[in-house]
């Protein structure tokens, strides 16, 4: 699959057919626990699907805010971008491909599938982590089907935990078992609140960023996930010019993770 097709498929996937089990609106936001009023709210923004284009990744490096980049394994620029992004002071995660409900969407190389046995799951996780050795955590790429498979997600998270990595459930399914399983394994973990760019319309992305800000104020912190689109960069730039955002700092994902 070429880079353009990959990015287009990723965008369309998030636009509805990804879930297969829930309404489109529930893909956008997930409510967390009410925040402690004595804690200052924070926003952590993850940029997914990194690894297929140098320019698309680099456009985020000059935003002058802490960002976390989730890098796909076995992509043309996986290793190069992991090093470059880390050198800029940003955090790096492994973007672990997992099976979606819609079989027309290819999660890409190094993916995990329903029915995979423990040996295959552990082997793939080991190989993918070795592809992104600077990773401090993992989140799922696609995975609306795989994250609903209790045995398989348990094996995957156990393998991730053995490397002392945290896990962020991207919540591509409202029935995902990933976060609950991670908690039972006593892993450092959390889950996505808002996908900011399921639509590439800049005004819609800006609206999602404001939604992310509201989540942070209400729950103490919020985790957003975006993708390497030019529209996403421009919307973030516009969002940062809003004086009302200055009281809610962007932080790296590690700053909001908890056990």
Show the residue positions of the predicted features.
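N-terminal secretory signal peptides and thylakoid transit peptides that target proteins
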Residues: 1-22, 26
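C-terminal segment of N-terminal export signals and the immediately downstream linker at the start
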Residues: 21-42
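Active-site beta->alpha N-cap acidic-glycine motif
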Residues: 36-104
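Short, well-ordered coil/turn segments that N-cap beta-strands
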Residues: 41-43, 65-67, 88-90, 133-136, ...
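Hydrophobic faces of well-ordered beta-strands that scaffold small-molecule active sites
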Residues: 43-47, 67-69, 92-94, 167-169, ...
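A generic structural motif
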Residues: 71-72, 97, 247-259
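Substrate-binding cleft of extracellular glycoside hydrolase catalytic domains
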Residues: 88-134
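Catalytic domains of cell-wall/extracellular-matrix polysaccharide-remodeling enzymes
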Residues: 118-209, 215, 227-249, 256
């Amino acid at each position: 699959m070429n880079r353009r097709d990959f990015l287009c498929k990723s965008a369309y996937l998030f636009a509805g057919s990804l879930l297969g089990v829930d309404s489109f609106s529930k893909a956008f936001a997930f409510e967390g626990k009410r925040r402690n009023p004595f804690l200052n709210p924070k926003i952590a923004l993850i940029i997914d699907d990194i690894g297929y284009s140098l320019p698309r990744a680099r456009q985020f490096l000059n935003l002058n805010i802490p960002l976390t980049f989730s890098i796909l394994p076995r992509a043309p620029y996986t290793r190069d971008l992991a090093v470059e992004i880390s050198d800029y002071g940003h955090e790096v995660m492994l973007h672990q491909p997992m099976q979606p409900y819609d079989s027309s969407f290819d999660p890409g190389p190094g993916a995990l599938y329903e029915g995979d046995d423990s040996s295959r799951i552990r082997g793939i996780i080991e190989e993918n982590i070795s592809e992104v050795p600077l990773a401090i955590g993992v989140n799922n790429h696609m995975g609306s089907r795989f994250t609903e498979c209790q045995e398989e997600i348990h094996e995957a998270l156990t393998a991730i935990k053995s490397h002392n990595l945290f896990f962020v459930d991207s919540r591509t399914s409202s029935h995902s078992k990933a976060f609950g399983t991670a908690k039972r394994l006593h892993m450092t973990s959390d889950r996505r609140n808002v996908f900011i760019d399921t639509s590439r319309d800049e005004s819609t992305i800006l609206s999602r960023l404001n939604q992310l800000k509201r989540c942070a104020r209400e729950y103490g912190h919020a985790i957003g996930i975006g993708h390497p689109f030019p529209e996403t960069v421009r919307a973030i730039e516009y969002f940062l010019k809003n004086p009302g955002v200055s009281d809610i700092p962007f932080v790296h994902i590690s700053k909001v993770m908890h056990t």
